[in-house]
């Protein structure tokens, strides 16, 4: 633990097209090898597809999808008397949103479709309909926390 004051995270600039911090966060997560322009093309293309499929504003749909896969509880390992316990803890808001975006992008990459635009748009649509890998991960994390509810008194 640092002895000095905690470092405040830098605020994320909103993306230029939609003016949304969430879209900027997704762009940064999609970006590989510093190629932000191609990441923007992918995310904006996926948002256009989502908007045309749903007939709603794409940023609103993305926010709803992220909200659907945002975890409430997670487990953290805690060592007590030589045994490791999986202790359920509430997820801080910033970490919860980061995890949701990470899961959406990671499971979009793992899909078998062709092209990242298709993968990302379909993963967002699946998350919106409470399906897909990202929603399954959220459900698994929540189930794990519920299964270990007996160790909640080890919370720190």
Describe the role of every protein-language-model region.
Residues 1-33, 37-40, 44-156:
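Strongly charged
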């Amino acid at each position: 633990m640092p002895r000095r004051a905690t470092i405040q995270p830098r605020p994320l600039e909103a993306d230029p097209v939609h003016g949304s911090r969430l879209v900027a966060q997704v762009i940064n997560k999609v970006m590989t090898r510093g190629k932000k322009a191609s990441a923007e093309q992918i995310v904006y293309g996926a948002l256009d597809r989502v908007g045309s499929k749903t007939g709603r504003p794409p940023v609103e749909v993305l926010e709803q999808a992220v909200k659907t896969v945002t975890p409430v509880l997670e487990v953290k390992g805690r060592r007590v008397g030589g045994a490791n316990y999986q202790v359920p803890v509430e997820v801080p808001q910033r970490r919860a949103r980061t995890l949701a975006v990470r899961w959406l992008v990671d499971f979009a990459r793992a899909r078998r479709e062709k092209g990242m635009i298709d993968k990302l748009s379909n993963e967002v649509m699946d998350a919106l309909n409470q399906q897909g890998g990202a929603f399954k991960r959220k459900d698994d994390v929540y189930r794990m926390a519920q299964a270990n509810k007996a160790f909640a008194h080890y919370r720190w």
